[in-house]
Amino acid sequence: MLLGKFIKTLNYTAPNASIVHVEIDARDGKNAYVNIDSPFTALPAALQGADWVQADNRDALYSAVDLMELAVANHATVWIAHDHRLPPPNWLTKQFKPANLTMNVAGQTMNLYRHDAKANASLTLGANTENTRLTEGNMYLVFVAAADKTP
């Protein structure tokens, strides 16, 4: 059983986990985050129709090595939209490649990273930043789309 079209399971360990969930069919006008008015605008083509984790933006500075764990369907592409103001954490740069695409969420530019998952992949995603001195930033967003969706 899938939570969405491409996300099979999700485990979210931050303080606001009870309201975080998987949404389907990403498109302009839908809210990026569960807790603030944050409609997608000019969503890149590769993300349109994707599943995404509708995270709580208040969890942006929460620190955990296993903040999110998800299993995805066969041959999916996992995308991370990460706030350009924050240095990318090690888990992001080790598992994902910069996609040279951006999007805007809640007034901030988000850099996109991609990971081409193979058969029934599971991923563990950590904290949004490793710098505990930061005081602001958008929570990263996770999108999962069919592998044939390219930028």
Can you say where each PLM-predicted feature lies in the sequence?
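Extracellular and analogous surface-interaction loops
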Residues: 59-60, 64-77, 113-121, 145-147
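Amphipathic alpha-helical interaction segments
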Residues: 41, 48, 60, 104, ...
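A mature extracytoplasmic/lumenal domain signature
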Residues: 74, 82-86, 129
